[in-house]
Amino acid sequence: MIVICQPDHEIVDKAVEFSVIMNKTDFYFIFIPGETYEIINFLTGPGLGNRFTVNSFSIDLIPIDNDLISMEREGSFKQLYVDNDITPISDFVDSFIKLELCFGKIKHKYIKGERAKVFCDLLSKKEIETNIKTTEEIFGMIVFDRNVDFLTPMTSNFTYEGLFDEHFGIKWGNVYIEKSYFKIGVKEREKNQKDFYSLTSESNPFHSIIRCMHYLDVNNYMNQLRNYYIEIAQKSKDVTNLTDIQEAISSYKDYLTNYKNPIEISARFINKFIDENHKEDNKNYRVKESIFLSGVFPDNLKLFYDDYITDKKDLIKLLNLFIIETLTQGGVKDYNLLKRDILNIYGYQNIFLFRDLETIGLLKEKAVLKKLTETSYQQIVSKLNLISTDIDYKKTKVKDCSYIYQGYCPIILRLIELAVQGKWNKFKDIITKLPGESIFPEDETEIVKPKSDEQKVHTIFVVFVGGVSYNEIEGIRFINRNLKSIYDKSKDKSVGRIQLIIVTNEILNRKKIFNRLGKEFNQAFAFKKFYEDIEKEEGGKGKEKK
């Protein structure tokens, strides 16, 4: 029997259970895009060692959209940060080198984080082995280790596509949604059926316009669009000549083809989210989150936690707020007491989830400080100007990233802005406070003023080792929209513009992160077979040994 699957705990458990029950020994696993050490150790462990043949089918970087390339290597986050397995980095480099074989060696590099440095070191070795020549086809790249900013994937989504991904799970630029979610009067037999929607810029022009907007702004835009087409429809009633009739028909056809269905879907989704967002529990949660992000400790937090645990509300949401407190305050106050209460009420099966989150460094007890000092996070917020209190959502041309994140600019997005402006050296003292090594060009003016005189697009790869969230993808798209032409004062002319393209080994969100942590293989069938083998070998004496 051949099983072709992703390296997923549940799939492997079911396959092992089936093979042991059916007593099948000719069992083949083909993992896409590759196996993990954890799975290999399990399948070759006690009782299972000779039952399975394991192989993998490698997948290279895949263009998800015109500005997004991903390996879609699910599980790489856990491998890198829980298992300390750098196989995903090695696979990522093997795929990335193929891009350089096509476009040439990338000269200018900004690197932040330990795993980002490992990626670039392995890439440099591959470049020497393959003798790739340096070109300016890809002008530069900014490489981040995911742990430079664990905070952003854990914060609430406010961009349209970020919300869409969190609710439905975008895969390969597409999404499947149950018919009953958007459509009224769906027949009973069709309620569980799903409709397919493509969200790429080519297949869904309307979605490509609204995806990096703040969700409140999407409502305004849809109303403007509706009014525009209503106005066209009214004018078409008085049309008399053939040319005007053709224009009216063309506009209506454009509306039916590109806008009618997406507008209806977006309107219903946004209205559902606004209703959900206005619930008292969600309001309180977001208030606490926003206070943490500003670097301040919220009032009555212990009471909020106690009530939340007592009422046995959503555990993932609670742990998410713990993580935000850990990353902004240096730890959770009374963490061990809260952890004990959670395990008592929610169940001790969650101890594995706590273990993994603690291993990564996302949960820990806050140290008791004798003297109150400004935390590293507070310094970062202040120096990088991450909080904006004067956001006006009625303005149509807001250029600061904090606009689409309810007043908070994610750390990584600010670092990207500084890189394309050639200002990492200016802010190096505060950048070094972030996890991992910082490496950037000695002469940053080459980034701001390319030597080429041609009017061209200067492409910069933004590389995420360990995954990127749609929360951040939409922020980078927002930066892309606001990047001005590169102007050289000495020559008094524009020398092109910068275009950012995102490259990663996995697209993730906070739900996916939690779903992949705290998972253990079901050892029951493995040990059952192990003891059966002992009994056969020793003529039934295995029971006494057991």
Regions found by a protein language model. Give the residues of each.
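Extended, well-folded catalytic/binding cores that form a central cleft or groove in large enzyme
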Residues: 1-546
